[in-house]
């Protein structure tokens, strides 16, 4: 959300929202038409007018707009996969496909591939290539009281499955992930099968870290995670390797232009058409996106290039505008509205795009909630160069989470963690014993750029010297977090940053 908003409401909005057509318009213009999700093929406008005619330009601009909005999350997902598994010389490279990479550390400001990262749980990542055969995810026993999860994300950014504390418990287990063409039975010794709509699946591992010395136990748990191909479980012959792929280079400037359509074309070859997307996939064929062969935007006529770029740029503008609209679904939008499986998110691709723009790979609401603070109690944008802020939890009214909660600081411009002398990027429930209590037993946190002084640093969450936002994460939330019985406290601005 980024435009006219009820600023007070924005304090509750989650850390991910980007584009939305005007809801409820009786006859919306082309730019605010019904969600591009998957219009029926019969109703779709497929460019058919003669080359370079005004009608064709109009049709192509509309297609460029719709294609950008429908494909945005898909292409954003590729950005992370390219960094993690393709660009071997890049700083974020983690290893080949089907190879688990676990880091026994938490995110810092030096990590730049994923915006709005969680720094409570050391991560593990594996991108599964399921073209040749399914992959088996094995997990060890995890002690009671420690949260862990494996989040399964397809190429659309749908969360289509979970393994972990909430869903399968902390016992050891083996879970098979299959691609869209796999038809085999459930193998013996497998606890559950997760079927993906796409051949490439990102699995995000999160393992709770209680405190710095606890990192050794996290390492032991991570060492118990494994990924193995199905043929090793069944002791059968290995299948033939899948064809080598010519992965397109990810370059931010290129993707801002027609390179976006080249990457989308590459990805759709790996994503079988599902009924919900038949309409938009048929329309994209008119410009060669998703058709056999490699798309080369240089083969477009000048008129077609101009029209597609105009539509794409309208889509970019719309995303930027809608990323600050807190009510684009007809009610106050939270992160719980933005992440989930296909059935939950439905045909409205605005939801997955908003999530991908401001915090890709967010959890489904049952797994975690992400209220975000972007404004203070008076509705003013947060800016630590202008004010200091306090956040008070009354006695007995800490965030209700069965696993844990955390409050993390982010730079308002980069959407990354904030460098600071204490190397403190968050305050969470495992730190409660070290926090100073108010006289009545409540807890008041201070969010500001300058240190409030040694005596007050225990409750200080350092902010950048400028715009910022803070995300409150509740892992495995209690019902009170859903039903409204727990109220999210507001950030209160104090006139000047506190001086040491």
Over which residues does each language-model region extend?
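Bacterial N-terminal signal peptides
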Residues: 11-22
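N-terminal secretory signal peptides that target proteins for export/translocation
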Residues: 1-7
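Bacterial signal peptide processing site
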Residues: 24-27
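Auxiliary, metal-adjacent structural segments of Zn-dependent hydrolase domains
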Residues: 29-31
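A compositional/structural signature for long, glycine/proline-rich flexible linkers
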Residues: 33-500
């Amino acid at each position: 959300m980024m435009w006219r908003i009820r600023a007070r409401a924005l304090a509750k909005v989650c850390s991910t929202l980007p584009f939305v057509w005007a809801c409820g318009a009786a006859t919306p213009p082309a730019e605010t038409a019904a969600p591009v999700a998957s219009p029926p093929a019969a109703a779709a406008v497929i460019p058919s007018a003669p080359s370079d005619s005004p009608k064709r330009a109009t049709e192509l601009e509309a297609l460029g707009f719709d294609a950008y909005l429908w494909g945005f999350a898909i292409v954003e997902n590729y950005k992370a996969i390219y960094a993690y598994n393709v660009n071997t010389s890049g700083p974020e490279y983690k290893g080949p496909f089907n190879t688990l990479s676990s880091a026994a550390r938490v995110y810092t400001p030096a990590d730049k591939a994923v915006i709005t990262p969680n720094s409570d749980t050391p991560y593990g990542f594996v991108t599964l290539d399921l073209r040749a055969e399914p992959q088996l995810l094995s997990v060890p026993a995890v002690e009671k009281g420690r949260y862990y999860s494996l989040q399964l994300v397809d190429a659309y950014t749908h969360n289509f499955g979970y393994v972990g504390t909430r869903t399968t418990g902390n016992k050891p287990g083996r879970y098979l992930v299959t691609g869209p063409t796999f038809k085999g039975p459930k193998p013996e010794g497998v606890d559950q099968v997760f079927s993906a709509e796409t051949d490439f699946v990102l699995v995000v591992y999160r393992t709770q870290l209680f405190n710095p010395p606890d990192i050794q136990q996290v390492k032991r748990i991570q060492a118990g995670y494994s990924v193995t191909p199905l043929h090793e479980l069944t002791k059968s012959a290995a299948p033939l390797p899948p064809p080598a792929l010519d992965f397109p280079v990810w370059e931010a400037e290129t993707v801002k232009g027609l390179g976006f359509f080249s990457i989308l074309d590459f990805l759709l070859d790996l994503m079988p058409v599902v009924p919900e997307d038949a309409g938009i996939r048929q329309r994209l064929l008119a410009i060669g996106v998703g058709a056999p062969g490699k798309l080369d935007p240089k083969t477009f006529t000048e008129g077609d290039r101009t029209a597609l770029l105009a539509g794409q740029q309208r889509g970019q503008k719309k995303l930027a505008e809608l990323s600050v609209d807190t009510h684009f679904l007809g009610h106050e939008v939270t992160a719980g509205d933005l992440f989930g499986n296909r059935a939950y998110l439905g045909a409205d691709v605005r939801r997955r795009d908003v999530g991908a723009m401001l915090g890709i790979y967010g959890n489904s609401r049952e797994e975690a909630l992400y209220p975000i603070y972007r404004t203070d109690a008076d509705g003013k944008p947060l800016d630590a160069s202008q004010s200091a802020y306090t956040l008070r939890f009354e006695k007995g009214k800490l965030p209700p989470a069965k696993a844990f909660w955390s409050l993390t600081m982010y730079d308002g411009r980069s959407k990354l963690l904030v460098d600071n002398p204490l190397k403190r990027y968050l305050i969470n429930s495992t730190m409660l014993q070290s926090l100073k209590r108010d006289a009545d037993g409540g807890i008041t946190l201070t969010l500001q750029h300058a240190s409030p002084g040694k005596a007050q640093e225990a409750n200080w969450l350092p902010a950048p010297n400028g715009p910022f936002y803070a995300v409150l994460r509740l892992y495995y939330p209690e019902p009170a977090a859903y039903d409204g019985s727990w109220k999210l406290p507001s950030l209160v601005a104090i006139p000047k940053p506190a001086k040491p």
